[in-house]
Amino acid sequence: MIGIYKIENTINHKVYIGQSVDIEMRWKEHLYALTRNLHENHHLQNSWNKYGAKAFTFSIIEECELSCLTDREQYYIDLYGGINSDNNYNNRDAGYKGNLSESTK
């Protein structure tokens, strides 16, 4: 399934918004990294470590065409306060595929 997904901390209600052409596989990748303390998003990883897996939910928030993935991901990142906000674990704009700098992590 192609679309936009949300990982939400049910305790503090912070969210991580992402996009994928295979949402189920992407969720498995997040789980793999988070459970091994390897997630590239240090803010999300720290919350996972603090609150535990049971404090997080994963949901698909929109199915969309491949051509609109980045625009829709950015829409939801902005809807939840934008990058590096108090409501959002996202630390880069939608569609970014490069490596994070140490300061961004």
Predicted regions and their residues:
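Structure-specific nucleic-acid interaction/processing domains
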Residues: 1-105
